[in-house]
UniProtKB/Swiss-Prot annotation:
Protein name: Listeriolysin O
The UniProt record lists the keyword Lipoprotein: no
Keywords in alphabetical order: Cytolysis, Hemolysis, Host cell membrane, Host membrane, Lipid-binding, Membrane, Secreted, Signal, Toxin, Transmembrane, Transmembrane beta strand, Virulence
Motif (Conserved undecapeptide): 483-493
Any one of the GO BP annotations: killing of cells of another organism
C-alpha cells in the first residue's frame, strides 16, 4: 500500500526528478527511499604536507580509531516501551452505539539510516560535522567534537552543474565555513543553471503509521518525533480508550543533497595539531566511537496528524485516499470519514521565512498543503531535514536500530436497532421475541444476558403494531409468532420462527392472512454492517 501511495503522490504533485543518478552503496535495508543522494561522494582534496610530528599524530589517531573495538550494529539502538500486561477487552454505551474496544500487543523494529532534523537541533547539523556515535545521537542531540578540522570537499546534486561546479573545497571545515560553502553552491546554481531548470521537482519521501503510543512513533520516525509531537499533540489517551483514530505521516520534499568526501583515513578529518590524547580526553572511545555527517538532505518537511472519531475499519483507507487524492465518490463510508476528519500539519522549510508553520484544517484541504513546495526555487529555500552519519573508522553507514512494544487499540461500534411488528391477520396472534445482550467483565470475558420482550405470549388482535428497541450489543435475535386456528386438533399454528437473526437498524416483521393460510414477511431497512 505504501508503494501505491508514493506513486499516487508522485504522479499528482511532482514530475519525475530531472537528474537520475547512479546508485551508491546499498542502503535499501535501511529504507532510505531516496532521502540521501545516491551520487558518488566527491574525492578528498589532496593532503597538505605534514611535519614529522604532525605525521606522528596522524598515524596515532588512525591507529587508535581503527583499533576501536565495537559492534556497529549495537552502537546506536533505541529501546522503547516493553509491554507486560495487555488491558482486557471492554464495551461501553455511547449514545445510540455500543462500542467494543480490543487491545493487542504489537512490536515495531525499524532501521533508520537517516536522522530527521527539526529546528531545535538544525544548528548542530551540517555536512562533515564530527560527532560521537552514542545515545545522544540516537536521541537526535548529536555531540559534536570541538576539534580543529582539516579540509574537505562538498558536492551538491542539483541538475545541470558541470565542470566541477557542483563541488567546493572547504579548507577549514568549521560549521560556519561549511554552511557558507553550501550557500555558495546553491547560489552558484541559482545564478548559472536555474534558468535552464526552472522547475526542479522535489524528491518525495513518504512514510505513515497509525498512532497508538509515543514510543511506537519514536521507533517509526526517530526521536525527532518527540519535538514534533509538542505541536502535533497526538491524542494517545483518546486513542487508548477507542474514542479516536489518528495517523501520523512524514512527508518530505527533498530539493537537494549535500555530500561529503569519504576520508581515506580517519586523521584526514582532523586538523594537523589534533592528537590522540585530545580525542581520548573528549571521550572518544569504543563506547563513543567517532562518526561524521556524510550527507544532509535540504528541503521541506511536513508532519501530518490525521484525526477522526470514527470507529470504522476503513479509516486507514480513507486517510490514504485523502493524502493521495484518490476519488472516493463511489464509497459513502469513505466519503463520510473524510468529511468528518481533520488534520494538523507541522511544516519545516519551503518558505522564505525562517519559521515553523502549524496549520489546522479539514481533510479536504490537505492536498493544498502537500502541493506547496513541490519545486525548488529562491522562494522555496531548503532547510536541513535529514542527515546520514558514517563511522569514521571505516566509513560504514551508522544505522540507528529502533524497537518498541506497544498496545494496538481497535474499536468497533454497533448501532442500536429496532424490530417493527405489524399484525393485520384475521386471527388472534401471540409473539415470542428474545435476544442476548453481550457485555464484558473486568477480565474481558463475555457476559451474556438473555432478554425477552415484555409482551411475549400475550394475545394480540388485528390491527396491532409495535416497535421493540434493541441496544447495539444485542445478538442472536429470535422472532416467533403463532396464530389461533380455532381447530380442535391444531389450536395454534406457527406463522414465523426465525432464529439467530443479526441486529439491524430496522427489521420489519409483518403477519397477515387467514387462520388456515397465515402469511408473514421479514424485511430489513438500512442493514448495519
Amino acid at each position: 500500500m505504501k508503494k501505491i501511495m508514493l506513486v499516487f503522490i508522485t504522479l499528482i504533485l511532482v514530475s519525475l526528478p530531472i537528474a537520475q543518478q547512479t546508485e551508491a552503496k546499498d542502503a535499501s535495508a535501511f529504507h532510505k527511499e531516496n532521502l540521501i543522494s545516491s551520487m558518488a561522494p566527491p574525492a578528498s582534496p589532496p593532503a597538505s604536507p605534514k611535519t614529522p610530528i604532525e605525521k606522528k599524530h596522524a598515524d596515532e589517531i588512525d591507529k587508535y580509531i581503527q583499533g576501536l573495538d565495537y559492534n556497529k550494529n549495537n552502537v546506536l539502538v533505541y529501546h522503547g516501551d516493553a509491554v507486560t500486561n495487555v488491558p482486557p477487552r471492554k464495551g461501553y454505551k455511547d449514545g445510540n452505539e455500543y462500542i467494543v474496544v480490543e487491545k493487542k500487543k504489537k512490536s515495531i523494529n525499524q532501521n533508520n539510516a537517516d536522522i530527521q532534523v527539526v529546528n531545535a537541533i538544525s544548528s548542530l547539523t551540517y555536512p562533515g560535522a564530527l560527532v560521537k556515535a552514542n545515545s545522544e545521537l540516537v536521541e537526535n542531540q548529536p555531540d559534536v567534537l570541538p576539534v580543529k578540522r582539516d579540509s574537505l570537499t562538498l558536492s551538491i546534486d542539483l541538475p545541470g552543474m558541470t565542470n566541477q561546479d557542483n563541488k567546493i573545497v572547504v579548507k577549514n571545515a568549521t560549521k560556519s565555513n561549511v554552511n557558507n560553502a553550501v550557500n555558495t553552491l546553491v547560489e552558484r546554481w541559482n545564478e548559472k543553471y536555474a534558468q535552464a531548470y526552472p522547475n526542479v521537482s522535489a524528491k518525495i519521501d513518504y512514510d505513515d503509521e497509525m498512532a497508538y503510543s509515543e514510543s511506537q512513533l519514536i521507533a517509526k520516525f526517530g526521536t525527532a518525533f518527540k519535538a514534533v509531537n509538542n505541536s502535533l499533540n497526538v491524542n494517545f489517551g483518546a486513542i487508548s480508550e477507542g474514542k479516536m483514530q489518528e495517523e501520523v505521516i512524514s512527508f518530505k520534499q527533498i530539493y537537494y543533497n549535500v555530500n561529503v568526501n569519504e576520508p581515506t583515513r580517519p586523521s584526514r578529518f582532523f586538523g594537523k595539531a589534533v592528537t590522540k590524547e585530545q580525542l581520548q580526553a573528549l571521550g572518544v572511545n569504543a563506547e563513543n566511537p567517532p562518526a561524521y555527517i556524510s550527507s544532509v538532505a535540504y528541503g521541506r518537511q511536513v508532519y501530518l496528524k490525521l484525526s477522526t472519531n470514527s470507529h470504522s475499519t476503513k479509516v486507514k483507507a480513507a486517510f490514504d485516499a485523502a493524502v493521495s487524492g484518490k476519488s472516493v465518490s463511489g464509497d459513502v463510508e469513505l466519503t463520510n470519514i473524510i468529511k468528518n476528519s481533520s488534520f494538523k500539519a507541522v511544516i519545516y522549510g519551503g518558505s522564505a521565512k525562517d519559521e515553523v508553520q502549524i496549520i489546522d484544517g479539514n481533510l479536504g484541504d490537505l492536498r493544498d498543503i502537500l502541493k506547496k513546495g513541490a519545486t525548488f526555487n529562491r522562494e522555496t529555500p531548503g532547510v536541513p531535514i535529514a542527515y546520514t552519519t558514517n563511522f569514521l573508522k571505516d566509513n560504514e553507514l551508522a544505522v540507528i536500530k529502533n524497537n518498541s512494544e506497544y498496545i494496538e487499540t481497535t474499536s468497533k461500534a454497533y448501532t442500536d436497532g429496532k424490530i417493527n411488528i405489524d399484525h393485520s391477520g384475521g386471527y388472534v396472534a401471540q409473539f415470542n421475541i428474545s435476544w442476548d445482550e453481550i457485555n464484558y467483565d473486568p477480565e474481558g470475558n463475555e457476559i451474556v444476558q438473555h432478554k425477552n420482550w415484555s409482551e411475549n405470549n400475550k394475545s394480540k388482535l388485528a390491527h396491532f403494531t409495535s416497535s421493540i428497541y434493541l441496544p447495539g450489543n444485542a445478538r442472536n435475535i429470535n422472532v416467533y409468532a403463532k396464530e389461533c386456528t380455532g381447530l380442535a386438533w391444531e389450536w395454534w399454528r406457527t406463522v414465523i420462527d426465525d432464529r439467530n437473526l443479526p441486529l439491524v437498524k430496522n427489521r420489519n416483521i409483518s403477519i397477515w392472512g387467514t387462520t388456515l393460510y397465515p402469511k408473514y414477511s421479514n424485511s430489513v431497512d438500512n442493514p448495519i454492517e
